[in-house]
Curated annotation (Swiss-Prot):
One of its GO terms (cellular component) is plasma membrane. The gene is htpX. This is Protease HtpX. GO terms for biological process: proteolysis. It is found in: Cell inner membrane. GO terms for molecular function: metalloendopeptidase activity; zinc ion binding.
Amino acid sequence: MKRIALFLATNLAVMIVFSIVLNIVYAVTGIQQGSLSGLLVMAVLFGFGGSLISLMMSKSMALRSVGGEVIEQPRNETEHWLLETVSRQAQQVGIGMPTVAIYDSPDMNAFATGAKRDDSLVAVSTGLLHSMTRDEAEAVLAHEVSHIANGDMITMTLMQGVVNTFVIFLSRMIANAVSGFTSSDEEGEGEGGSFMTYFIVSTILELAFGFLASFLTMWFSRHREFHADAGAAQLVGKQKMIAALERLRMGQESQLEGSMMAFGINGKKSLTELLMSHPPLEKRIDALRQM
């Protein structure tokens, strides 16, 4: 309940701030709100704004969502090994030492997030630490560190911002045309009817275009996973990376809770593969073997 309340409060605050900023931009530039240029300004502001704010808050939101505990001082040999391994890999790829956290989950999962290469987070589940060998866990960590080194979080945010901008702009532009056409053809409807037409059409189009755009963003996400696997193979050797993926394939299939779960994926092929953020495990293993 607290997490939902925090999410709603954050979104409300973002919407209020965006509205204020948008009105200031219109006032300073003299752009008319109903014009195409005004619509484009609004689409860019809202399209990129949400993505950038989510990126800036990603570390704290990720830790809160999984109940992760940051390792400040290692309390046991496993935590000491975890910090030492991440530190060594970070030095190898030339990034700052990420914050390292552990969260309680029986699934073999890990994820990386953060707005900067030198201010990032790597979190691993207790299930991964208990179920994988050190070599396999090392490969998983290398995969996450490679995501950070490649700037995947920032790249995905920028891509999502561009996609959001096009979805908002096209939806509102078409809705403007439709509402203008219907209001001129239908007598007695007035401004209220025109607004309702605009609202309904723009909402439906944003949902439809957003769904279609998700195929593109998920394709890009799968593409970056192959790069992270290759980066991990360079850090620790491809046999360790293959062994980690084989362990995941043999393990219990995990159900993801959002795009931040960067390593736990379902290896089963299905018709929904185009909407998966990760390639099937078999394809990732084959790609590594062909390196």
